[in-house]
Design a protein with these regions (language model features):
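Cytosolic covalent-transfer regions centered on His/Cys nucleophiles
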Residues: 2-185
């Protein structure tokens, strides 16, 4: 039986994916993805102001544009909104991973935000969401995109790690914690 991409349309092949991005330039079908390769400290919001789901998507998009000025905020917001229409990316335990694919991108990019109060993001467990990890990938990057989503999901399943992120006061502290936890085997 042939393996297919996330949409079940194109067969997956064991090959090296090439691009100008460190996150995809040497990723093979079996290689692991490291979050530090696509999340910069400048794209982290230590204390989000958003109070609604649309505001979260806009605030995360704005942070990504500030870190990567070549991106267009409205396009990012629209991509994330369209994905949310398919079903909430609130995975539970206070975590959401809004994500989407954007034409014209050459690399995988991410932004992360902490809502100290938490808000309703229509998470699968019905609990307020406090940790938002948004991921935007090039249009044809199914393998790397899915590996990154899996890596983020695994990382944020750890309750002690989630608690340490909520206690971190600055974007630099949050980034350091994510990089440290992501480096563990």
């Amino acid at each position: 039986m042939q393996k297919h991409d996330g949409e079940g349309k194109r067969p997956l092949r064991e090959k090296v994916v090439r691009s100008n991005c460190p996150s995809t330039s040497s990723v093979t079908a079996g290689a692991s993805v490291r979050i530090a390769e696509f999340l910069s400290p400048q794209a982290i919001i230590a204390d989000m102001q958003a109070r609604t789901k649309p505001e979260v998507l806009r605030e995360l998009s704005g942070a990504l544009v500030r870190a990567h000025p070549h991106l267009q905020e409205e396009k990012l917001v629209e991509v994330l909104r369209e994905r949310e229409k398919l079903g909430s990316t609130g995975i539970g335990e206070g975590v959401a991973i809004p994500h989407g694919k954007l034409a014209g991108m050459s690399q995988l990019l991410a932004t992360f935000g902490v809502s100290r109060e938490g808000l309703d993001f229509e998470a699968i467990d019905g609990k307020p969401t406090q940790l938002f990890f948004a991921l935007v990938a090039p249009e044809n990057s199914a393998g790397v995109h899915l590996k990154a989503l899996a890596r983020i999901s695994r990382l944020f399943k750890n309750p002690r790690f989630r608690a340490s992120i909520l206690e971190a006061p600055t974007a630099a502290d949050i980034h350091a914690l994510i990089v440290q936890e992501d480096a563990r085997p």
